[in-house]
Amino acid sequence: MNSPVIPRRAFVARLLGASALGVAGALTVAEDATADDVARAPGDSARGNAVVQWNAIAAEAFAPSEGTNPMAQSRTFAILHAAIHDALNAIVQRYGSYTPGFAAAPQASADAAVAAAAHEVLVRLVPEQAALVEAAYRRLLVTLRDGPAMTAGTAIGRAAARATLSRRAGDRADSAAQPLYAPRPGPGEYQFTAPFDFAAQPGWGRVEPFIIDLREHALDGPQALTSVEYARDLAHVRDIGHAASRTRTPEQSEIAKFWYEDSPLGWNRIASTVVRQRGLDPWEAARAFALVHFAMADGFVAGFAEKYRHRFWRPETAIAAAASDGNPLTEADRAWRPFLTTPPVPDYPSTHTVLGWAA
Protein backbone atom coordinates (compact mmCIF):
# COMPACT_ATOMS: atom_id res chain seq x y z
CA MET A 1 0.00 0.00 0.00
CA ASN A 2 1.07 3.63 -0.09
CA SER A 3 3.79 4.60 2.36
CA PRO A 4 2.81 6.28 5.64
CA VAL A 5 2.22 10.03 5.73
CA ILE A 6 5.34 11.93 6.79
CA PRO A 7 4.88 15.56 7.92
CA ARG A 8 6.41 17.91 5.37
CA ARG A 9 8.23 19.97 7.98
CA ALA A 10 10.33 16.91 8.92
CA PHE A 11 12.14 17.18 5.60
CA VAL A 12 12.92 20.91 5.59
CA ALA A 13 16.13 20.76 7.62
CA ARG A 14 17.72 18.23 5.27
CA LEU A 15 16.23 19.57 2.05
CA LEU A 16 19.39 20.72 0.30
CA GLY A 17 21.69 18.01 1.62
CA ALA A 18 19.33 15.17 0.69
CA SER A 19 18.95 16.50 -2.82
CA ALA A 20 22.70 16.69 -3.29
CA LEU A 21 23.03 13.08 -2.16
CA GLY A 22 20.22 11.97 -4.46
CA VAL A 23 21.99 13.34 -7.54
CA ALA A 24 25.56 12.83 -6.39
CA GLY A 25 28.13 13.99 -8.89
CA ALA A 26 25.91 16.57 -10.57
CA LEU A 27 26.89 20.23 -10.67
CA THR A 28 30.11 19.64 -8.75
CA VAL A 29 32.07 22.45 -7.14
CA ALA A 30 34.65 24.24 -9.26
CA GLU A 31 37.63 24.86 -7.02
CA ASP A 32 39.07 27.89 -8.80
CA ALA A 33 36.21 30.36 -8.14
CA THR A 34 36.15 32.62 -5.11
CA ALA A 35 33.61 34.82 -3.37
CA ASP A 36 35.43 37.84 -4.80
CA ASP A 37 34.84 36.50 -8.32
CA VAL A 38 31.12 36.39 -7.64
CA ALA A 39 31.12 39.81 -6.04
CA ARG A 40 32.70 41.25 -9.19
CA ALA A 41 30.12 39.67 -11.50
CA PRO A 42 27.88 42.42 -12.93
CA GLY A 43 24.53 42.46 -11.14
CA ASP A 44 22.50 44.42 -8.63
CA SER A 45 21.85 42.50 -5.41
CA ALA A 46 19.67 45.35 -4.15
CA ARG A 47 16.94 44.10 -6.48
CA GLY A 48 16.96 40.74 -4.76
CA ASN A 49 18.02 37.32 -5.94
CA ALA A 50 17.06 36.98 -9.60
CA VAL A 51 17.11 33.18 -9.33
CA VAL A 52 14.48 33.25 -6.58
CA GLN A 53 12.43 35.77 -8.55
CA TRP A 54 12.34 33.59 -11.66
CA ASN A 55 11.59 30.50 -9.63
CA ALA A 56 8.52 32.32 -8.30
CA ILE A 57 7.51 33.40 -11.81
CA ALA A 58 7.75 29.79 -12.99
CA ALA A 59 5.60 28.63 -10.08
CA GLU A 60 3.04 31.31 -10.92
CA ALA A 61 3.02 30.17 -14.54
CA PHE A 62 2.23 26.63 -13.42
CA ALA A 63 -0.41 27.55 -10.85
CA PRO A 64 -3.33 28.17 -13.28
CA SER A 65 -2.41 25.16 -15.41
CA GLU A 66 -4.69 22.59 -13.83
CA GLY A 67 -4.41 20.32 -16.85
CA THR A 68 -0.62 20.20 -16.74
CA ASN A 69 0.64 16.87 -15.49
CA PRO A 70 3.02 17.04 -12.51
CA MET A 71 5.66 14.99 -14.31
CA ALA A 72 5.85 17.60 -17.07
CA GLN A 73 6.06 20.30 -14.40
CA SER A 74 8.99 18.53 -12.75
CA ARG A 75 10.79 18.24 -16.08
CA THR A 76 10.26 21.93 -16.87
CA PHE A 77 11.47 23.04 -13.43
CA ALA A 78 14.61 20.90 -13.84
CA ILE A 79 15.35 22.28 -17.32
CA LEU A 80 14.69 25.84 -16.13
CA HIS A 81 17.09 25.65 -13.21
CA ALA A 82 19.73 23.75 -15.17
CA ALA A 83 19.74 26.57 -17.73
CA ILE A 84 19.89 29.28 -15.06
CA HIS A 85 22.67 27.42 -13.26
CA ASP A 86 24.74 26.97 -16.41
CA ALA A 87 24.27 30.60 -17.45
CA LEU A 88 25.58 31.86 -14.12
CA ASN A 89 28.52 29.48 -14.17
CA ALA A 90 29.48 30.71 -17.63
CA ILE A 91 29.95 34.12 -16.01
CA VAL A 92 31.79 32.91 -12.91
CA GLN A 93 32.35 29.18 -12.69
CA ARG A 94 31.72 27.98 -9.17
CA TYR A 95 30.16 24.64 -10.10
CA GLY A 96 30.30 22.22 -12.99
CA SER A 97 27.74 22.67 -15.76
CA TYR A 98 24.89 20.35 -16.68
CA THR A 99 25.36 21.16 -20.37
CA PRO A 100 28.92 22.41 -20.95
CA GLY A 101 30.29 23.68 -24.21
CA PHE A 102 29.19 27.28 -24.73
CA ALA A 103 31.54 30.25 -24.41
CA ALA A 104 32.28 31.88 -21.07
CA ALA A 105 31.13 35.46 -20.53
CA PRO A 106 32.94 36.87 -17.47
CA GLN A 107 31.75 40.45 -18.05
CA ALA A 108 28.09 39.56 -18.50
CA SER A 109 25.27 40.74 -16.24
CA ALA A 110 24.20 37.87 -13.99
CA ASP A 111 20.66 39.22 -13.65
CA ALA A 112 20.27 39.55 -17.43
CA ALA A 113 21.59 36.01 -17.90
CA VAL A 114 19.15 34.55 -15.38
CA ALA A 115 16.21 36.43 -16.88
CA ALA A 116 17.06 35.45 -20.47
CA ALA A 117 17.60 31.78 -19.60
CA ALA A 118 14.35 31.56 -17.64
CA HIS A 119 12.35 33.44 -20.25
CA GLU A 120 13.62 31.22 -23.08
CA VAL A 121 12.77 27.97 -21.25
CA LEU A 122 9.35 29.02 -19.96
CA VAL A 123 8.11 30.45 -23.25
CA ARG A 124 9.16 27.23 -24.98
CA LEU A 125 7.82 24.75 -22.42
CA VAL A 126 4.81 26.59 -20.96
CA PRO A 127 3.52 28.40 -24.07
CA GLU A 128 0.02 28.81 -22.64
CA GLN A 129 1.53 31.18 -20.05
CA ALA A 130 3.68 33.13 -22.53
CA ALA A 131 1.86 36.40 -21.80
CA LEU A 132 2.59 36.12 -18.07
CA VAL A 133 6.25 35.28 -18.72
CA GLU A 134 6.69 38.08 -21.27
CA ALA A 135 5.17 40.63 -18.89
CA ALA A 136 7.48 39.54 -16.07
CA TYR A 137 10.48 39.64 -18.39
CA ARG A 138 9.68 43.18 -19.54
CA ARG A 139 9.22 44.36 -15.94
CA LEU A 140 12.61 42.98 -14.94
CA LEU A 141 14.43 44.28 -18.03
CA VAL A 142 13.62 47.90 -17.19
CA THR A 143 15.43 47.47 -13.85
CA LEU A 144 18.68 46.45 -15.58
CA ARG A 145 21.33 48.88 -16.74
CA ASP A 146 21.55 48.86 -20.52
CA GLY A 147 24.98 48.30 -22.01
CA PRO A 148 27.52 45.63 -22.94
CA ALA A 149 27.05 43.66 -19.69
CA MET A 150 23.31 43.38 -20.22
CA THR A 151 23.78 42.41 -23.87
CA ALA A 152 26.33 39.75 -22.96
CA GLY A 153 24.15 38.45 -20.12
CA THR A 154 21.14 38.12 -22.38
CA ALA A 155 23.21 36.25 -24.95
CA ILE A 156 24.69 33.80 -22.44
CA GLY A 157 21.29 33.19 -20.83
CA ARG A 158 19.72 32.36 -24.17
CA ALA A 159 22.66 30.15 -25.10
CA ALA A 160 22.37 28.21 -21.83
CA ALA A 161 18.63 27.75 -22.28
CA ARG A 162 18.97 26.55 -25.85
CA ALA A 163 21.79 24.17 -24.95
CA THR A 164 19.73 22.66 -22.13
CA LEU A 165 16.59 22.40 -24.26
CA SER A 166 18.62 20.79 -27.03
CA ARG A 167 20.08 18.25 -24.61
CA ARG A 168 16.59 17.29 -23.41
CA ALA A 169 15.09 17.13 -26.90
CA GLY A 170 14.20 13.55 -27.67
CA ASP A 171 14.09 12.48 -24.00
CA ARG A 172 10.76 10.72 -24.73
CA ALA A 173 8.65 13.06 -22.57
CA ASP A 174 6.50 13.93 -25.59
CA SER A 175 5.42 10.30 -26.02
CA ALA A 176 4.91 9.43 -22.36
CA ALA A 177 1.12 9.11 -22.70
CA GLN A 178 1.64 6.06 -24.91
CA PRO A 179 1.03 3.20 -25.11
CA LEU A 180 -2.37 3.40 -23.46
CA TYR A 181 -2.68 1.26 -20.35
CA ALA A 182 -4.85 -1.84 -20.69
CA PRO A 183 -5.95 -3.32 -17.34
CA ARG A 184 -5.47 -7.04 -16.86
CA PRO A 185 -7.86 -9.13 -14.76
CA GLY A 186 -6.79 -10.80 -11.55
CA PRO A 187 -5.94 -10.10 -7.90
CA GLY A 188 -3.37 -7.37 -7.41
CA GLU A 189 -3.74 -5.95 -10.93
CA TYR A 190 -4.27 -2.21 -11.22
CA GLN A 191 -7.75 -1.25 -12.42
CA PHE A 192 -9.04 2.22 -13.28
CA THR A 193 -10.54 4.05 -10.30
CA ALA A 194 -13.46 6.48 -10.33
CA PRO A 195 -13.90 8.97 -11.87
CA PHE A 196 -11.12 8.02 -14.31
CA ASP A 197 -11.26 5.65 -17.26
CA PHE A 198 -7.53 5.83 -18.02
CA ALA A 199 -4.12 5.53 -16.40
CA ALA A 200 -1.95 8.65 -16.53
CA GLN A 201 1.37 8.81 -18.38
CA PRO A 202 2.13 5.07 -18.59
CA GLY A 203 5.29 5.84 -20.56
CA TRP A 204 6.83 8.35 -18.15
CA GLY A 205 9.12 5.67 -16.77
CA ARG A 206 10.85 5.61 -20.17
CA VAL A 207 11.71 9.33 -20.08
CA GLU A 208 15.47 9.87 -19.93
CA PRO A 209 16.49 10.78 -16.36
CA PHE A 210 18.54 13.90 -15.72
CA ILE A 211 21.15 12.19 -13.54
CA ILE A 212 20.32 8.74 -12.20
CA ASP A 213 20.74 5.30 -13.74
CA LEU A 214 17.32 3.62 -13.62
CA ARG A 215 18.95 0.20 -13.39
CA GLU A 216 20.11 1.10 -9.89
CA HIS A 217 16.59 1.98 -8.71
CA ALA A 218 14.55 -1.15 -9.40
CA LEU A 219 12.31 -2.33 -6.55
CA ASP A 220 11.45 -5.89 -5.54
CA GLY A 221 7.73 -5.15 -5.59
CA PRO A 222 4.81 -4.73 -3.19
CA GLN A 223 3.99 -7.08 -0.34
CA ALA A 224 2.59 -10.48 -1.25
CA LEU A 225 -1.21 -10.46 -1.24
CA THR A 226 -1.23 -13.48 1.06
CA SER A 227 1.13 -11.98 3.66
CA VAL A 228 0.24 -10.86 7.16
CA GLU A 229 1.87 -7.49 6.43
CA TYR A 230 -0.38 -6.90 3.44
CA ALA A 231 -3.51 -7.74 5.45
CA ARG A 232 -2.40 -5.41 8.25
CA ASP A 233 -1.71 -2.50 5.91
CA LEU A 234 -4.94 -3.01 3.98
CA ALA A 235 -6.93 -2.96 7.23
CA HIS A 236 -5.17 0.23 8.29
CA VAL A 237 -5.97 1.96 4.99
CA ARG A 238 -9.54 0.67 5.09
CA ASP A 239 -10.10 2.13 8.56
CA ILE A 240 -8.24 5.44 8.35
CA GLY A 241 -8.71 6.15 4.64
CA HIS A 242 -12.47 5.65 4.38
CA ALA A 243 -14.44 8.70 3.30
CA ALA A 244 -16.55 8.35 6.46
CA SER A 245 -13.80 7.03 8.74
CA ARG A 246 -14.50 7.10 12.47
CA THR A 247 -10.86 6.53 13.40
CA ARG A 248 -9.22 9.29 11.35
CA THR A 249 -8.61 12.39 13.46
CA PRO A 250 -9.21 15.95 12.21
CA GLU A 251 -5.44 16.49 12.23
CA GLN A 252 -4.91 13.40 10.07
CA SER A 253 -7.53 14.67 7.65
CA GLU A 254 -5.72 17.98 7.36
CA ILE A 255 -2.38 16.24 6.84
CA ALA A 256 -3.91 14.12 4.08
CA LYS A 257 -5.31 17.21 2.34
CA PHE A 258 -2.00 19.02 2.74
CA TRP A 259 -0.07 16.18 1.10
CA TYR A 260 -2.67 15.56 -1.60
CA GLU A 261 -1.09 18.12 -3.93
CA ASP A 262 0.29 15.97 -6.72
CA SER A 263 2.90 18.39 -7.98
CA PRO A 264 6.51 19.52 -7.50
CA LEU A 265 5.14 22.96 -6.57
CA GLY A 266 4.86 22.08 -2.87
CA TRP A 267 8.49 21.09 -2.48
CA ASN A 268 9.51 24.01 -4.67
CA ARG A 269 7.86 26.35 -2.16
CA ILE A 270 9.87 24.73 0.62
CA ALA A 271 13.09 24.97 -1.39
CA SER A 272 12.43 28.65 -2.06
CA THR A 273 11.82 29.27 1.64
CA VAL A 274 15.09 27.55 2.59
CA VAL A 275 17.04 29.43 -0.09
CA ARG A 276 15.71 32.77 1.15
CA GLN A 277 16.12 31.98 4.84
CA ARG A 278 19.72 30.90 4.33
CA GLY A 279 20.49 33.97 2.26
CA LEU A 280 21.98 31.99 -0.62
CA ASP A 281 23.57 34.02 -3.39
CA PRO A 282 22.40 33.47 -7.00
CA TRP A 283 25.03 30.79 -7.72
CA GLU A 284 24.16 28.85 -4.56
CA ALA A 285 20.44 29.29 -5.14
CA ALA A 286 20.69 28.13 -8.74
CA ARG A 287 22.55 24.99 -7.69
CA ALA A 288 20.13 24.27 -4.84
CA PHE A 289 17.06 24.62 -7.07
CA ALA A 290 18.67 22.55 -9.83
CA LEU A 291 19.55 19.70 -7.45
CA VAL A 292 16.10 19.68 -5.86
CA HIS A 293 14.35 19.61 -9.23
CA PHE A 294 16.76 17.10 -10.77
CA ALA A 295 16.00 14.81 -7.83
CA MET A 296 12.23 15.23 -8.13
CA ALA A 297 12.19 14.88 -11.91
CA ASP A 298 14.25 11.70 -11.72
CA GLY A 299 12.08 10.52 -8.83
CA PHE A 300 9.03 10.75 -11.05
CA VAL A 301 10.78 8.81 -13.82
CA ALA A 302 12.01 6.08 -11.49
CA GLY A 303 8.70 5.95 -9.64
CA PHE A 304 6.62 5.64 -12.79
CA ALA A 305 8.96 3.02 -14.22
CA GLU A 306 8.22 0.90 -11.16
CA LYS A 307 4.51 1.76 -11.03
CA TYR A 308 3.90 0.46 -14.51
CA ARG A 309 6.24 -2.49 -14.08
CA HIS A 310 4.40 -3.78 -10.98
CA ARG A 311 0.89 -2.54 -11.96
CA PHE A 312 -0.34 -2.91 -8.37
CA TRP A 313 -3.96 -2.27 -7.54
CA ARG A 314 -5.23 0.68 -5.52
CA PRO A 315 -6.75 0.29 -2.04
CA GLU A 316 -10.31 0.90 -3.23
CA THR A 317 -9.94 -1.95 -5.73
CA ALA A 318 -8.14 -4.15 -3.21
CA ILE A 319 -10.77 -3.62 -0.50
CA ALA A 320 -13.68 -4.26 -2.86
CA ALA A 321 -12.04 -7.41 -4.23
CA ALA A 322 -10.51 -8.72 -1.00
CA ALA A 323 -12.47 -11.96 -1.29
CA SER A 324 -10.34 -12.85 -4.32
CA ASP A 325 -6.88 -12.01 -2.93
CA GLY A 326 -6.25 -15.42 -1.33
CA ASN A 327 -5.66 -13.90 2.10
CA PRO A 328 -7.99 -15.12 4.88
CA LEU A 329 -7.07 -12.08 6.98
CA THR A 330 -8.56 -9.50 4.59
CA GLU A 331 -12.20 -8.46 4.48
CA ALA A 332 -14.08 -7.26 1.40
CA ASP A 333 -16.19 -4.10 1.42
CA ARG A 334 -17.67 -3.15 -1.95
CA ALA A 335 -19.16 0.06 -0.53
CA TRP A 336 -15.79 1.44 0.62
CA ARG A 337 -14.79 4.82 -0.83
CA PRO A 338 -11.56 6.79 -0.24
CA PHE A 339 -11.39 10.07 1.67
CA LEU A 340 -9.72 11.77 -1.32
CA THR A 341 -9.95 10.94 -5.02
CA THR A 342 -7.39 8.33 -6.03
CA PRO A 343 -4.89 9.54 -8.65
CA PRO A 344 -5.14 7.58 -11.92
CA VAL A 345 -1.89 5.63 -11.59
CA PRO A 346 -0.92 2.26 -10.08
CA ASP A 347 -0.29 2.20 -6.35
CA TYR A 348 3.29 0.97 -5.92
CA PRO A 349 5.50 2.81 -5.21
CA SER A 350 3.95 6.01 -3.84
CA THR A 351 5.45 8.84 -5.89
CA HIS A 352 4.28 11.32 -3.25
CA THR A 353 6.75 9.61 -0.93
CA VAL A 354 9.38 9.35 -3.67
CA LEU A 355 9.24 13.12 -4.22
CA GLY A 356 9.46 13.79 -0.49
CA TRP A 357 12.59 11.75 -0.04
CA ALA A 358 14.10 13.01 -3.30
CA ALA A 359 13.64 16.65 -2.30
Outline where the language-model segments fall:
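N-terminal secretory signal peptides and thylakoid transit peptides that target proteins
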Residues: 2-19
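C-terminal segment of N-terminal export signals and the immediately downstream linker at the start
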Residues: 4-5, 25-45
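Bacterial N-terminal signal peptides
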Residues: 18-26
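Acidic/polar surface patches and capping/hinge elements
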Residues: 36-359
